[in-house]
């Protein structure tokens, strides 16, 4: 089984590589420090499993990487590394193509089990995250039912269309303001207008929307 590990912390990449390489049926063929590099390593090695950190640097979101990689390389099973403060992303990651989730502080045995589970084509979700996943599924179902059939994308202003992909990529208000030569308050106002116009309730919904509109590219 060929594995690629993508995490922006070298200690995580090294530690997980040691654990998995110790297994007779597993080989870590490459590691990556961000979503862009993860895509390149998957393209190069065509691994059976990609272990991907959800919390990537701005511009290289784990959610974006999951969507791009699962679309281009459906044969590679994606296992997401996450923390409790990432719970709002769980449902959206599954929709984007992830096959499972595991907490970064999980025991070695659980990591190995998770890798083998997704490799076999099954879904693995840490029991500690299951409740959050179910709640998010219910909330998303309700949102889908009440959403309008018309697409509000066309009513976004030119500036809002510039800001939307930057927010989705994980850039903060200050970073966006500097990129576009506007004030932080202006960015905050546009962000509020975008969420209102598109009827979006959370950051994961905004990222998913941007992906659907093909506004995000590596």
From Swiss-Prot:
Member of the two-component regulatory system NreB/NreC involved in the control of dissimilatory nitrate/nitrite reduction in response to oxygen. Phosphorylated NreC binds to a GC-rich palindromic sequence at the promoters of the nitrate (narGHJI) and nitrite (nir) reductase operons, as well as the putative nitrate transporter gene narT, and activates their expression. PROSITE patterns: HTH_LUXR_1 (PS00622), HTH_LUXR_2 (PS50043), RESPONSE_REGULATORY (PS50110). Phosphorylated by NreB. One of its GO terms (biological process) is regulation of DNA-templated transcription. Its main location: cytoplasm. Coiled coil: none annotated. Residues 149-214 form the HTH luxR-type domain. Keywords: Activator, Cytoplasm, DNA-binding, Phosphoprotein, Transcription, Transcription regulation, Two-component regulatory system. GO terms for molecular function: DNA binding. The lineage of its organism: Bacteria, Bacillati, Bacillota, Bacilli, Bacillales. GO terms for cellular component: cytoplasm. SUPFAM superfamilies: C-terminal effector domain of the bipartite response regulators, CheY-like. It is found in: Cytoplasm. InterPro entries: CheY-like_superfamily, Sig_transdc_resp-reg_C-effctor, Sig_transdc_resp-reg_receiver, Tscrpt_reg_LuxR_C, WalR-like. CDD domains: LuxR_C_like (cd06170), REC_NarL-like (cd17535). Residues 173-192 bind DNA. It comes from the Bacteria. It comes from Staphylococcus epidermidis (strain ATCC 12228 / FDA PCI 1200). This is Oxygen regulatory protein NreC. Residues 2-119 form the Response regulatory domain. The modification 4-aspartylphosphate is found at residue 53. The keyword Phosphoprotein applies.
């Amino acid at each position: 089984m060929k594995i690629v590990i993508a995490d922006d912390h070298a200690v995580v990449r090294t530690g997980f590589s040691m654990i998995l390489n110790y297994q007779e049926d597993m080989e870590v063929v490459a590691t990556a420090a961000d979503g862009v590099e993860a895509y390149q390593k998957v393209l190069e090695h065509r691994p059976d499993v990609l272990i991907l950190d959800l919390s990537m640097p701005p511009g290289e979101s784990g959610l974006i990487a999951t969507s791009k990689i699962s679309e281009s390389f459906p044969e590679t099973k994606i296992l997401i590394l996450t923390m409790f403060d990432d719970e709002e992303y769980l449902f959206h990651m599954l929709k984007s193509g992830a096959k499972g989730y595991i907490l970064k502080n999980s025991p070695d045995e659980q990591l190995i089990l998770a890798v083998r589970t997704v490799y076999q084509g099954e879904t693995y979700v840490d029991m500690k995250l299951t409740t959050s996943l179910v709640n998010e599924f219910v909330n998303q179902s309700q949102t889908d039912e009440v959403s309008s059939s018309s697409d509000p994308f066309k009513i976004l202003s030119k500036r809002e269309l510039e800001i939307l992909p930057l927010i989705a990529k994980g850039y903060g208000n200050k970073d966006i303001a500097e990129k576009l030569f506007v004030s932080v308050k202006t960015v905050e106002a546009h962000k509020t207008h975008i969420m209102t116009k598109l009827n979006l309730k959370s950051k994961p919904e905004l990222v998913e929307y941007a992906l659907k509109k093909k506004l995000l590219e590596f």
